[in-house]
């Protein structure tokens, strides 16, 4: 069995965030509605929420120095260095169910989460 050497691109950190097909597809739809191909989805962690930290999402046109960059199906996801330490190995998904549709982050680093799913503690 032969292995192909892969080049390392320091702007890409695939362990910072795992993105599902459904999450990438939904973000692509949202970007199309905004009519700006330069948009990227920034996923971040901030202080707050009932468990101490909360997840946030915003569109951004710029990749900042130190950002982890994850590409999935033509969509770019960004994570800043501070948030990256909390999101390492986390998965972002988009689910549709009886409760409606929403982005869900499954974070192996979170020790507790609140009922709303957008707040956690480590």
Swiss-Prot record:
Keywords: Iron, Iron-sulfur, Metal-binding. Iron-sulfur cluster binds at residues 50, 114, 116. Pfam families: Fe-S_biosyn. One of its GO terms (biological process) is iron-sulfur cluster assembly. Binds 1 iron-sulfur cluster per subunit. GO terms for molecular function: 2 iron, 2 sulfur cluster binding; 4 iron, 4 sulfur cluster binding; iron ion binding. Its cofactor is iron-sulfur cluster. Gene3D superfamilies: HesB-like domain (2.60.300.12). InterPro entries: FeS_biogenesis, FeS_cluster_insertion, FeS_cluster_insertion_CS, FeS_cluster_insertion_RrpA, HesB-like_dom_sf. Required for insertion of 4Fe-4S clusters for at least IspG. Belongs to the HesB/IscA family. Homodimer. NCBIfam families: iron-sulfur cluster assembly accessory protein, PRK13623.1. This is Iron-sulfur cluster insertion protein ErpA.
């Amino acid at each position: 069995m032969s292995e192909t050497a892969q080049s390392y691109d320091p702007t890409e950190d695939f362990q910072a965030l795992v993105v599902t097909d459904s999450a990438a597809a939904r973000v692509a739809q949202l970007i199309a509605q905004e009519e700006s191909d330069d948009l990227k989805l920034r996923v971040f962690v901030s202080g707050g929420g009932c468990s101490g930290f909360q997840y946030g999402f915003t569109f951004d046109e710029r990749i900042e120095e130190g950002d982890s960059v994850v590409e999935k199906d033509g969509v770019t996801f960004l994570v800043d260095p501070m948030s990256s330490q909390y999101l390492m190995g986390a998965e972002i998904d988009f689910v549709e169910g009886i409760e409606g549709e929403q982005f869900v982050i499954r974070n192996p680093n979170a020790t507790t989460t609140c009922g709303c799913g957008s707040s956690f503690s480590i």
